[in-house]
Amino acid sequence: MITLHNGNETIELLTDDNSYSYEAVMGEDTLTLYFSHPGYLNVPVGSWCEFYGKRYSLKKDSNFKKNGERNYSYTLVLETSKADTELWKIRNTVDNRIKFPYTAKPKEHLKLIVDNLNRRSSGWVIGECIEGTEKLINYNHTVCLDALSQLAETYEIEYQITETVIEGVHTKTVHLKKV
């Protein structure tokens, strides 16, 4: 049983055994839910659930199929906050430019990315980070997820985004380390 939340409303779902979660290093982190319902069920974008300590949100409309008069089959693909990193561009924190060169150590590059993520939402923090020399990365209309990939490639390392929900506080930690 999965409980979806949307504002003050909750929806209890009895999911099929085919439902699954998928997480890849430097890749997607999704929760796919399959379920049936005797009537149409409105599951609005923004609905969320907690699953094994992570918060998954519905970022796109649900997919449903009508099988007769009283049977709807639903597929919901919920994503972690990592999906939001594909929406927002990196800006220079000094003058707001979106095209700029930046020479810094790994932790400073990571701080730039986390600062940009916190401009749009809250709860993003820096986690473990490698030590390294200063290197130049050119940001040119770069979204945050691509900036993380570029940073990992520059230092030949991996990034990881972990999420925790403790007593209602949602924290998203960005690590730059060997995963």
What are the language-model segments listed below?
Residues 79-179:
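Charged- and aromatic-enriched interaction segments used to assemble
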